[in-house]
A protein has these predicted regions:
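Extracytoplasmic
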Residues: 13, 17-47, 65, 118, ...
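Residue-level signature of mid-helix packing/kink "hotspots" within the transmembrane helices
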Residues: 30, 58-66, 116, 149-150, ...
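Helix-to-loop junctions at the C-terminal end of transmembrane segments
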Residues: 65-76, 264-277
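Conserved MFS/SLC helix-loop-helix module at the cytosolic interface between two early adjacent transmembrane helices
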Residues: 63-101
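Cytoplasmic helix-loop-helix junction between adjacent transmembrane helices
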Residues: 107-144
C-alpha cells in the first residue's frame, strides 16, 4: 500500500492513529517535570541534579530535530517511526529502572532524541491526507500533539503521587510500544523524496537557514520561548515541594493551565478590543 492509495475514509482513521502517536511520543519529554521531587527523594539528588533531567531531555529533543529529522527525506517514514517508537519505549523502560543520576541523565537525553518521532508523524499526515484536506488532517495530528503536551504533566503528576515515578515511566513505555505497533500495522510505506547523502542533507539545512530570514527569526523566537518555558517547568515542582509542601499531583495540575488559551479563538472578534486596557 502506498500513501496515494488511501481513501478519505481510510485516511481519517489513520490520521486519528497518528494523532495518538504524536501525543504519546511528545508526552515522553514532559513526564519528568512534575516528578522531579519524587525522583530526587528516591535517588538522593540535589536540586541541581533534578534540574538537569528536564534540561537534558529538552536538549535531546532539539538535537533530534536538528540531526534526525532530515532522515525523513531519505528514508521511509514508516520505518523511521517504528525504529523511534521501539527505541523510545525501551528508553522509557530503562529510565524506570535507573538507580543513579548519571544513567538517568544519559537516558533522559536519549528520550528527548527518540521523542522526535512526533515530528516524523506530522509530515506523514500531510502526505497521507487526501487532496484538499491536508490542513484539516495536519491540524488533527497537531491537536493530538498539543494534547500530549498539555495533559502529560497532569497525568504524570497524579500517577507519580499514587503509584510512584517509576510506574509512570513503565506505563509510558507500554503506551509508546502499543501505539508504535499500531502505526506500523496501519501505515503505508512512504516514498523517498531525496537521494542526497546525510552530509548533503545537513548542508541543505544550512542553506535554508542562510536564505530565509523569516525562518531564522521564527526559529530563534521559538527557541527562546522554549527555553523560558522549560526553565519554569524545571523548577516548579521542586519549588512547590520545598516551599509549599505540595506533591507531584499539584505540580502536574499546573499543566492544564494552558487549556484556557484556546478560549479566545471562540470569542467574538470585538472582545479583545473591549478587554484591552484603556490608556
Amino acid at each position: 500500500m502506498t500513501p496515494t492509495s488511501l481513501s478519505t475514509r481510510d485516511a481519517g482513521w489513520i490520521i486519528f492513529i497518528l494523532a495518538l502517536g504524536a501525543g504519546f511520543s511528545v508526552a515522553s519529554i514532559y513526564y519528568a517535570q512534575p516528578l522531579l521531587p519524587l525522583m530526587g527523594a528516591n535517588l538522593h539528588l540535589t536540586v541541581e541534579g533534578m534540574g538537569l533531567v528536564p534540561t537534558l531531555t529538552q536538549a535531546g529533543y532539539a538535537l533530534g530535530i536538528l540531526f534526525l529529522l532530515p532522515l525523513g527525506d531519505r528514508h521511509d517514514r514508516r520505518r523511521l517511526i517504528l525504529v523511534k517508537s521501539v527505541l523510545l519505549a525501551l528508553l522509557l523502560l530503562l529510565c524506570s529502572l535507573t538507580g543513579q543520576l548519571s544513567s538517568l541523565l544519559v537516558v533522559s537525553l536519549l528520550i528527548g532524541m527518540a521523542a522526535t518521532m512526533a515530528q516524523d508523524i506530522v509530515p506523514a499526515a500531510a502526505i497521507l491526507a487526501p487532496a484538499g484536506k491536508q490542513g484539516k488532517m495536519v491540524g488533527t495530528v497537531m491537536t493530538g500533539l498539543l494534547l500530549g503536551i498539555l495533559l502529560s504533566r497532569t497525568v504524570s503528576g497524579v500517577v507519580g503521587a499514587v503509584f510512584g515515578w517509576r510506574v509512570m515511566y513503565q506505563a509510558a513505555a507500554v503506551s509508546v510500544a502499543l501505539i508504535g505497533l499500531v502505526m506500523w500495522r496501519v501505515l503505508p510505506r512512504f516514498a523517498v523524496h531525496s537521494t542526497l547523502s546525510y552530509p548533503q542533507l545537513m548542508a541543505s539545512m544550512a542553506h535554508l537557514w542562510q536564505r530565509y530570514p523569516a525562518l531564522r527569526r521564527a526559529a530563534l523566537a521559538q527557541g527562546a520561548l522554549s527555553i523560558a518555558f522549560s526553565a519554569f517547568w524545571s523548577t516548579l515542582a521542586v519549588m512547590l515541594s520545598e516551599h509549599y509542601h505540595m506533591g507531584s499531583a499539584v505540580a502536574g495540575g499546573f499543566g492544564i493551565a494552558g487549556a484556557p488559551g484556546r478560549w479566545p479563538r471562540r470569542l467574538p472578534a470585538v472582545w479583545p478590543i473591549n478587554l484591552a486596557p484603556v490608556r
